[in-house]
Amino acid sequence: IGTKYAVGVNSGTDAIKLSLKALNIGPGDEVITAANTFVATVGPICELDATPVFVDCNDTFCMDTNLVEEKITSKTKAFLPVHYTGYMTDMRVMNRLSEKYDIPVIEDACQSILGAIDGKNAGTWGKTGAFSLHPLKNINVWSDGGVIVTDDDELYKTLRLLRNHGF
């Protein structure tokens, strides 16, 4: 897919949750995400006692990046764009905002395994990318599964610990 590391987990939901935990997202934090998504994107945010902040979507049903900046507050600790049906949130804009505000990006690429912008694959633009291998997803296994991808050495180590009941 184009990253240094991939960490297998039991689901796309856990791929998102462990990514959030690895970035120390918790009580009182806000996570900006797409209004058009499945509970598996928002559930992990709430499970960590953080607050989802929703951004409306554009014609591709992905987050409208023109509306993201107005949602940023001092409590914003992560961006969680959702790529949908092969379409991707404009990650060039998301990464510019990430650099400008020092807010990490976790990509929900569970529905866009083969999506790409400028030849760069979905899930490879942010600090982590979360993929689902659920039977109803683009690439699936007989039961369920998930994958977290990253280029960050320390995040990789943390994710491996968290995957095995680490704290």
Regions found by a protein language model. Give the residues of each.
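Short, conserved catalytic or interaction motifs in soluble domains
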Residues: S11, C57, Y84, P135, ...
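Short loop-beta-helix segment that forms the pyridoxal 5′-phosphate
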Residues: I1-S19, T33-T37, V55-D56
